[in-house]
Amino acid sequence: MQTSSSRSVHLSEWQKNYFAITSGICTGPKADAYRAQILRIQYAWANSEISQVCATKLFKKYAEKYSAIIDSDNVESGLNNYAENILTLAGSQQTDSDKWQSGLSINNVFKMSSVQKMMQAGKKFKDSLLEPALASVVIHKEATVFDLPKFSVCGSSQESDSLPNSAHDRDRTQDFPESNRLKLLQNAQPPMVTNTARTCPTFSAPVGESATAKFHVTPLFGNVKKENHSSAKENIGLNVFLSNQSCFPAACENPQRKSFYGSGTIDALSNPILNKACSKTEDNGPKEDSSLPTFKTAKEQLWVDQQKKYHQPQRASGSSYGGVKKSLGASRSRGILGKFVPPIPKQDGGEQNGGMQCKPYGAGPTEPAHPVDERLKNLEPKMIELIMNEIMDHGPPVNWEDIAGVEFAKATIKEIVVWPMLRPDIFTGLRGPPKGILLFGPPGTGKTLIGKCIASQSGATFFSISASSLTSKWVGEGEKMVRALFAVARCQQPAVIFIDEIDSLLSQRGDGEHESSRRIKTEFLVQLDGATTSSEDRILVVGATNRPQEIDEAARRRLVKRLYIPLPEASARKQIVINLMSKEQCCLSEEEIEQIVQQSDAFSGADMTQLCREASLGPIRSLQTADIATITPDQVRPIAYIDFENAFRTVRPSVSPKDLELYENWNKTFGCGK
């Protein structure tokens, strides 16, 4: 009977939930019905009424339906679980006013019973450790006594030197927090004020009348911190301000007392307005103190950074930051001709700005920044920085073995360039190196690589420039850049100035040429070999071009060595193939390499590199598209000769026979080769 009754109960509940699900009611009851179904499934499976497989299927089915309602963003079919309850709670609440103040203050914290117990325990411990010598501060179990004198400004010196009776002052007590008394014990007794009647007007302010007044507590020494801080130790100060009136007028500041207390305490004690503001702060809540860290202008911050960077002594007094008039930027007013002082300097040292010595701005506004080298004194620092950072090449070193072929050109360059730079003591006089070298020939033969190898093997500073790096939209900037380039190169001797595509910079001058372009060429020729140049300068200009016939005659004269870089011969092409294939997996025999070299006649060095790159893609192209995503690098087959045969069908020589004939004729006329 129990089994049949329980089944009937389960059946009725199942039917009830099914009716709630299938009816057109809102989504809330539907979600509850699905959740009830899931609970029934778990209960039936726990009591072994259904199998695990059946429970898993049913649970998955109803869980998906339940999540479809819960996770849906649709207003009609989904269920918003949170918005309704949140809006209900927030709908009846009134918004807080902007003038709302928190009930949690320092006074309320000190009135708590737990804090009072801690303070009493601290008092007992401090009383046990109190020494008899500290007579100026007497700590009882319930009160703290301060030996404050009764100041009578108009009295004689004897009256001002006398101290009040200790028994009379013992009645005027005031409770202070534990940390206040601890620091007051360390600070002992302040010095007495003596003979103030000569300098002060008639004024008398006895301290005894304000014994019951509440003291405002701030630090005796150091800066005043904000009261509304999260730490209780930082909120509790030590400096005592009278809440009703000041003890000292503004004209009665004693130097000894001022040096003892610090400027912040004396200002607060001597200024009645500030004293009144402090008492108002105690009543109305925490307010920001006037002795917070002062604002620093961009110039002052830059000066501090320079002092820290160059480890120079701090020469600025306290008036450098607080005693002068604050203004954004420079200390003087900026007009039309004023100079903006950036907060962070661009130059980060003497070497990166072309030998310019970076000067701290605090050293003086009229003190100029003198360059380390006299040859750079008339140059703009921005141009020097551009040359040092953008034009100077910091690439990897290049060896002569990396250049295939051109044995005559390499031997000539070693003879006239590398050796004189390595041994300048031997190559003097007529043995001195030339001022310029011109490397001409078809494109892709290694002219740029030779220029880098010259700088790498000779240990020289390498400048790689182009026509675009020397031109500017401003009139006169191009020739200034050329002058700065050679000036920096003279400071960085030995130096190699490599000009790729030199025909675009030193083309033939004509009547229809622009004036700015003509001035740049003239300045370049003068700096290369002019009246101001020295024969002892170890500066080499290396120009590379594939259009030598367009170079100006004056530039051609200054480029003394004009070396023809022809297409690589068979041995050079073989060396290129072997060097490139040694880095890859290949199965080429010696005969196959010879066939590749023979078929690649009239190929330049760049064409040979492109041929090997195209052949290396052959094994990848032989794979199926589906295998590329799953195959490992070790499963890719090596490069075979058939890949080179397929590559020869797509790669052609980039130099025509007509261009080769032009180069050979120019070499016979102006070249220095065999």
Swiss-Prot record:
Top EC class of this enzyme: hydrolase
Effect listed in the UniProt record for changing residue 340 to E: Reduces weakly interaction with RAD51. Strongly reduce, but does abolish, interaction with RAD51
InterPro entries for the chain: AAA+_ATPase (IPR003593), AAA_lid_3 (IPR041569), ATPase_AAA_core (IPR003959), ATPase_AAA_CS (IPR003960), FIGNL1_ATPase (IPR047858), MT-severing_AAA_ATPase (IPR050304), P-loop_NTPase (IPR027417), Spast_Vps4_C (IPR015415)
Cofactors (names): Mg(2+)
UniProt feature, compositional bias: Basic and acidic residues: 167-179
Organism from which the protein derives: Homo sapiens (Human)
Cross-link position per record: Glycyl lysine isopeptide (Lys-Gly) (interchain with G-Cter in SUMO2): 225
Domain of life according to the entry: Eukaryota
Subunit text: Hexamer. Interacts (via N-terminal one-half region) with RAD51; the interaction is direct. Interacts (via N-terminal one-half region) with SPIDR (via the C-terminal region); the interaction is direct. Interacts with FIRRM; may regulate homologous recombination.
Record remark on domains: The N-terminus is necessary for its recruitment to DNA damage sites.
SUPFAM superfamilies in UniProt: P-loop containing nucleoside triphosphate hydrolases (SSF52540)
Similarity comment text for this entry: Belongs to the AAA ATPase family.
GO terms for biological process, alphabetical: ATP metabolic process; cellular response to ionizing radiation; male meiotic nuclear division; negative regulation of apoptotic process; negative regulation of intrinsic apoptotic signaling pathway; osteoblast differentiation; osteoblast proliferation; regulation of cell cycle
Gene3D superfamilies in alphabetical order: 1.10.8.60, P-loop containing nucleotide triphosphate hydrolases (3.40.50.300)
Enzyme Commission numbers on file: 3.6.4.-
Binding site for ATP: 404, 444-449
Cited function: Involved in DNA double-strand break (DBS) repair via homologous recombination (HR). Recruited at DSB sites independently of BRCA2, RAD51 and RAD51 paralogs in a H2AX-dependent manner. May regulate osteoblast proliferation and differentiation. May play a role in the control of male meiosis dynamic.
Subcellular location: Nucleus; Cytoplasm; Cytoplasm, Perinuclear region
Protein name according to UniProt: Fidgetin-like protein 1
Cellular component GO terms held in the UniProt record: cytoplasm; extracellular exosome; nuclear chromosome; nucleoplasm; nucleus; perinuclear region of cytoplasm
Reaction(s) catalysed (UniProt annotation): ATP + H2O = ADP + phosphate + H(+)
Major location (coarse): nucleus
Annotated GO MF terms: ATP binding; ATP hydrolysis activity; hydrolase activity; magnesium ion binding; microtubule severing ATPase activity
Sorted UniProt keywords: Acetylation, ATP-binding, Cytoplasm, Hydrolase, Isopeptide bond, Magnesium, Metal-binding, Nucleotide-binding, Nucleus, Phosphoprotein, Ubl conjugation
Impact after mutating residue 447 to A: Inhibits HR-mediated DNA repair
